[in-house]
């Protein structure tokens, strides 16, 4: 994901740039280039952070050998942000999806910098979003990273989803949190394999609305070619049951907008054609993606996405609240993968700000009393006591993808053992029986079939009737289903 040769020198004091729910590895470099070149990138000691649950100041040191290459030998200081989160605007979770190298992270950086001009976000450079060293080295995003920004009418948490095929697992987690998505497609290349897979996954995990950004417009000389790409994108979205003809499509160049904003961070609307495209995109997002109805009246449930251990404070679980409310002092159950146990919430935080209570749709970190890091893992859920139980056997209605949709080329039979992706977990399961539309036992399932199956998972997971899941095998999605009944 080559961006620019413009080097952005990080200041000697960095604030934490990410909320507790994102990937936990933070790095910084003394001269962190925004390019994908092999320029010097010193790696800091990798440290797991979760902002205001930390001591007020956490120091990250460069190793002595790395320090010699730097202009100054002073260590970076990462300070925890403080303060309260105030709900002045509706909160939405959106994200960038699309093929690797089409410009998702560049667009995310351009969005935060453009909205920072209006005083509505903290600007994030490209390399602050693509934070982990292996991502920066390969120029690709692996873990989903989250930033926040505001428009005039809304507050957004923005997930930058990976486009690299190896890391679709993390993209599923990111997509499962979205109220809407910005699909980034290179105007020069058109839709590519991961473009299709991301649209399919967005449909499977229930992303309700999509807005399209046709990137790299500056690289397309022929206006007709851009129109053909737009037509192709609309047809592709329609083929996955999105309203392709109605979806807003904005074309522009995230890179030229980002470079303009880095050269002049005070650029306002009307001063630069490429920056104006970024504002136009957010206008469309504000108009087209509806404010979701949050299920605040239902019992609390949060699927754990990541876990941090903070010395002298305890263990923090992060994730998006699926339903209900939670506040400090609430007792919650820890369900799935292991024996159910309960704990008390001793801290609630979102985007480095303390919350009195958190509600459905919020990306939060919850500090838990008496829980060790080894007791808790991604894929478990935190829930109101007694409202959800772990199960390992269920029946489901499943659609098996055709070869043309990226699915299997051959049928599968009873005894098939793929991976089942549910909320933030993936667990191996065995298909023990297959029934056709008439509830008659069937021997095999062909790509393109819609069948009823019974599944036995190798470990119990917190599941419910009506829950959606994806079936994956060998690095690709082969099916999607809905749980019909819990058996045991």
Swiss-Prot record:
Pfam families with a match to the protein in the record: GTP_EFTU, GTP_EFTU_D2, GTP_EFTU_D3
Ranges where the record places region G4: 215-218
Transit peptide: 1-79
Molecular function (Gene Ontology), one example: GTP binding
Keywords: Chloroplast, Elongation factor, GTP-binding, Nucleotide-binding, Plastid, Protein biosynthesis, Transit peptide
Tissue expression: Higher expression in leaves than in roots.
Region feature (G2): 139-143
tr-type G domain segment(s): 89-293
Main location per the UniProt record: plastid
Annotated segments matching region G3: 160-163
InterPro entries in the cross-refs: EF-Tu_GTP-bd, EF-Tu_GTPase, EFTu-like_2, EFTU_2, G_TR_CS, P-loop_NTPase, Small_GTP-bd, T_Tr_GTP-bd_dom
HAMAP family membership: EF_Tu_B (MF_00118_B)
UniProt function note: This protein promotes the GTP-dependent binding of aminoacyl-tRNA to the A-site of ribosomes during protein biosynthesis.
This protein's name: Elongation factor Tu, chloroplastic
Source taxonomy: Eukaryota, Viridiplantae, Streptophyta, Embryophyta, Tracheophyta
């Amino acid at each position: 994901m080559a961006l620019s040769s413009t080097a952005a020198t990080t200041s000697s004091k960095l604030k934490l740039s990410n909320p507790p729910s994102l990937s936990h590895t933070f790095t910084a470099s003394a001269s962190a280039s925004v390019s994908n070149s092999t320029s010097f990138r010193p790696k800091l000691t990798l440290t797991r952070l979760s902002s205001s649950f930390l001591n007020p100041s956490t120091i990250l040191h460069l190793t002595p050998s790395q320090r010699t290459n730097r202009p100054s030998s002073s260590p970076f200081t990462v300070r925890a942000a403080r303060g309260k989160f105030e709900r002045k605007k509706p909160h939405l979770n959106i994200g960038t999806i699309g093929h690797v190298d089409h410009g998702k992270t560049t667009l995310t950086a351009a969005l935060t910098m453009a909205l920072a001009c209006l005083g509505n976000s903290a600007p994030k450079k490209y390399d602050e979003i693509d934070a982990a060293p292996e991502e920066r080295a390969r120029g690709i995003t692996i873990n989903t990273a989250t930033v926040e920004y505001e428009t005039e009418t809304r507050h957004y948490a923005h997930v930058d989803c990976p486009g690299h095929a190896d890391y679709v697992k993390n993209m599923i987690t990111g997509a499962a949190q979205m109220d809407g998505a910005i699909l980034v497609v290179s105007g020069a290349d058109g839709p590519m394999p991961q473009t299709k897979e991301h649209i399919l996954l967005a449909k499977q995990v229930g992303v309700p609305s999509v807005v399209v950004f046709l990137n790299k417009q500056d690289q397309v000389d022929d206006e007709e070619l851009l129109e053909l790409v737009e037509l192709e994108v609309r047809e592709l979205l329609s083929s996955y049951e999105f309203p392709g003809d109605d979806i807003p499509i904005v074309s522009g160049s995230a890179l030229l907008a980002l470079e303009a904003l880095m050269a002049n961070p005070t650029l306002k609307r009307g001063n630069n054609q490429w920056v104006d495209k970024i504002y136009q995109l957010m206008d469309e997002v504000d108009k087209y993606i509806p404010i979701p109805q949050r299920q605040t009246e239902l019992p609390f449930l949060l699927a754990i996405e990541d876990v941090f251990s903070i010395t002298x404070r305890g263990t923090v679980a992060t994730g998006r609240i699926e339903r209900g409310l939670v506040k400090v002092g609430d007792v919650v159950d820890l369900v799935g993968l292991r024996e159910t146990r309960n704990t008390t919430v001793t801290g609630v935080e979102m985007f480095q700000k303390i919350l009195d209570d958190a509600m459905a749709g919020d990306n939060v970190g919850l500090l838990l009393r008496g829980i060790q890091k080894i007791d808790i893992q991604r894929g478990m859920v935190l829930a109101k006591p007694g409202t959800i139980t772990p199960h390992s056997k269920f029946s489901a209605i499943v659609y098996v993808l055709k070869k043309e949709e990226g699915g299997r080329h051959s049928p599968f039979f009873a005894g098939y053992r793929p991976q089942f992706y549910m909320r933030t977990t993936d667990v191996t399961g065995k298909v023990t029986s297959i029934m056709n539309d008439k509830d008659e036992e069937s021997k095999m399932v062909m790509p393109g079939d819609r069948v009823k199956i019974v599944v036995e998972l190798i470990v119990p997971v917190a599941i419910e009737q009506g829950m959606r899941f994806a079936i994956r095998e060998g690095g690709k999605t082969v099916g999607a289903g809905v749980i019909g009944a819990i058996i045991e």
